[in-house]
Amino acid sequence: MTISLRNRPVGVAATAAALALTALAALATAAPASASGPAPATALAPASAAPGEPTAPTLPRPTGRYATGRDTLFLTDHTRTDPWVPAAGPRQLLVSLNYPARPGTGGDPAPYMTEEEARLMLAQRGLEDVVPPALVGATRTHARTAARPAPGRFPLVLLSPGFGTPRATLTGLAEELASRGYVVATADHPYESTGTQLPDGRVLTCAACDKVDAQPDDAARREVLAAVPAGRADDFSFLLDRLTGPDPAWRHSRTIDPRRVGMAGHSIGGNAASSTMAADRRVDAGVNMDGTFFDPAPVRGLDGRPFLMLGTDPGHGPGSDTSWDDAWARLDGWKRWLTVRDSGHFTFTDTPEIGEQLGLEDPEAPLSAARSTTITRSYVTAFFDRSLRGRPARLLNGPTPANPEVLFQRP
């Protein structure tokens, strides 16, 4: 679901802030129409506003037994030219690494995003003069910068955000997985987000979005969108080389077990998970959270590797997005197709928590922030526990009374 607020009148600043945060990442989502521009405005109802100025939101605390740390890597792939802006030179990646940490170590809580990145997200919705970008950028996280890693070696999970969406929107899931004993690498793909601020201060905007918008019809837009997950597969193969190869870029690379690698993504990032698995045998398992398969799953399947499709209901139920029906037929390993009642496209990101804390109610996605967070964390973690650790995952065996919103699709 894409929510457009560009032409929506607003009242008090607190209400506008809440509305804006629902659209933090909504440039392009699961369908070509939404990829080419804003969808018609969705009716949004603000809850009763609390008096006073809004305060920075706080992400839900991770539930695992580990404290979490965060490092950031800025990597350059000198073997590839950037596909969206060739004049920029080699392809570059900005990567957040969340990892299990020793308690009591590290510095301040890691930042959510920069103020400029927040401003660009709000500007895309015409709200940069209404919502303080600093409020969005100051969202409170739980990982500590430069914390000492916990002893041991841990499976690696790669995370890829939606098209036009910063990697920050998957921070809550990254921290949860790290607290459960995973190293998590979340990538910003240059020129595929509203704004990515590099360590030297440069800001890269969404040239890929502009290219999609410039196409004359849906078929042409789909062709460009199919290049996004295919290109991200190259990004993640390069990232795997730099994290697990003989000359690793990360100082704590010894904590990664390279024999156990999974990948999850939101929206087109979920398609990138299957594309990366198709291109790189090192990725053992994948999750698509509500993303259309613009780059189809291979006809031959994924060599028996497990895959979870987790989406909105009915938006990604059988027959709603035919790319999911096609992918389901091609997946040749252990697989599950789950949909979530009352959810929206951004249910699987940090957006519900941020919006709800600022008093937002979205009639088209009435699932609460708490349930959105619990469902996403529980099912994604259960899948990786099963696929990368060989642990029983009863949650994935069928419907449970504790999660009545989660539907098991068996087309």
Task: Report residues per predicted region.
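Active-site machinery of serine-nucleophile hydrolases
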Residues: 98-104, 111-127, 169-215, 341
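The feature captures the conserved acid-bearing segment of alpha/beta-hydrolase catalytic domains
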Residues: 284-347
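Alpha/beta-hydrolase-fold serine-hydrolase catalytic core, especially in secreted/extracellular enzymes
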Residues: 37, 49-60, 67, 78, ...
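Primarily recognizes the serine-hydrolase "nucleophile elbow" in alpha/beta-hydrolase
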Residues: 239-301
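Secretory targeting and sorting signals
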Residues: 1-38
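Domain-level recognition of soluble alpha/beta enzyme cores
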Residues: 49-157, 365-369, 380
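Short substrate-entry loop that stabilizes the transition state in hydrolases
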Residues: 138-154, 159-197, 315-318
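Alpha/beta-hydrolase active-site loop
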Residues: 197-255
